[in-house]
A protein has these predicted regions:
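Extracellular glycan-interacting surfaces
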Residues: 1-232
Length: 232
């Protein structure tokens, strides 16, 4: 268990004030920054996992207590760490993302909480491009077979021509707020894909993403995809 001195979870405060919280991922560990609404002065807690590359930290909005952290560790490689007390204590998850084939997870880049009606569900995106799901609050992870073992995956992911794992990754995972089975993912060296059946099947949705070299709907290279909060 990795223990840290950290501020307790935010408490209810008067409506006229608010607390700003930033979860910051760096090559030297993770940090949590706090400030008021003026943001002139900041408190900082961390680093968490000093000496590890932290790719992503995210607070679960469904309980406002749980934080998941994707890190590249020197001893165990790509791992996910979990805190259920807002960063005061961290533990590695029991079963991190792992491919069922000879392909190996090089990095874990993205962590996304599931739909609000599924408080136990999380998603993770990796390099090389892989999509994983947890149904036990992030403790154990399994492949989303409809994507990872899709017969068209090589066609989707190898149009850019790079072999660098630094670039080949799933960096964006979105769940429709009104439909937990509606998923959108964004990939570097791949593009944007949509599933309407919980990840069992996927359709490219790259029309409108401009490129000079590719004429079909595959092989785009977005670096981030986000949902509009009012019109997902």
């Amino acid at each position: 268990m990795h223990k840290t001195l950290a501020k307790k979870a935010p408490v209810r405060i008067e409506k006229k004030t608010s607390e700003i919280i930033l979860l910051v991922s760096t090559s030297k560990g993770g940090f949590i920054y706090y400030s008021d609404e003026k943001r002139r002065f900041w408190e900082v807690n961390g680093p968490y996992l000093l000496g590890s590359i932290v790719h992503h930290m995210i607070l679960d909005p469904r309980d406002s207590q749980t934080i998941l952290m994707a890190a590249q560790t020197k001893t165990h490689g790509p791992m996910i760490f979990k805190s259920v007390d807002f960063g005061m204590n961290w533990v590695p998850v029991k079963v991190p993302p792992k491919f069922s084939t000879s392909k190996k997870v090089a990095h874990i880049y993205r962590l996304t909480p599931g739909h609000e009606t599924e408080p136990n569900v999380w998603y993770a995106g990796t390099s090389p491009q892989g999509l994983f799901k947890s149904e036990d609050f992030g403790d154990t992870w399994m492949e989303v077979n409809g994507f990872n073992n899709n017969s068209k995956l090589d066609e989707w992911c190898e149009r850019i021509g790079t072999s660098s794992l630094k670039y080949e990754k799933i960096h964006s995972i979105m769940i429709h707020p009104r439909n937990p089975r509606s998923l959108i993912i964004g990939m570097s060296s791949g593009g944007v894909f949509e599933s309407m059946d919980g990840g069992e099947s996927w359709t490219p949705m790259n029309e409108g993403l401009l490129t000079n070299d590719i004429s079909d709907s595959l092989g785009r290279d977005p670096h981030l995809v986000v949902q509009h909060p009012m019109d997902p």
